[in-house]
Amino acid sequence: MQRYLISYEFTDGEDQEEGGEMLINWYESGGPQNRPENYEVHSWIFMVQNGIGHSVVSADSLETIWKQWHPWRRLMDISIQPCMDLDETVGLLKKQKMNTRFV
């Protein structure tokens, strides 16, 4: 599975209020327990004061991510980018360093 950074921002206060209600309903109906096996949340941060949040997830595809996020798409701007954690970054840098030594 690939790791992704999901960044999101509500477009206005009304959308944030509606999104908050949706989140409460999703959470109270077992939302986190109903995620597919091929979708894992590593971290979730939301700054309610400015309507901006970030999540780091692992998923088998972008399609899996969009299935989780589609209810909120009309309320917020969402961007998804591949990312790595510290161990993965160090491993990649070491690999690149080794490859340049043999050139």
Model regions and ranges:
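Conserved catalytic core of Hanks-type protein kinase domains
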Residues: 58-59, 71
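Short S/T/G/P-rich N-terminal loop/turn motif that feeds into the first structured element of a domain
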Residues: 1-52, 60-64, 90-103
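Short amphipathic alpha-helices in soluble, non-transmembrane regions
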Residues: 65-74
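Conserved short beta-strand edge segments in small beta-sheet-based binding/regulatory domains
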Residues: 75-87
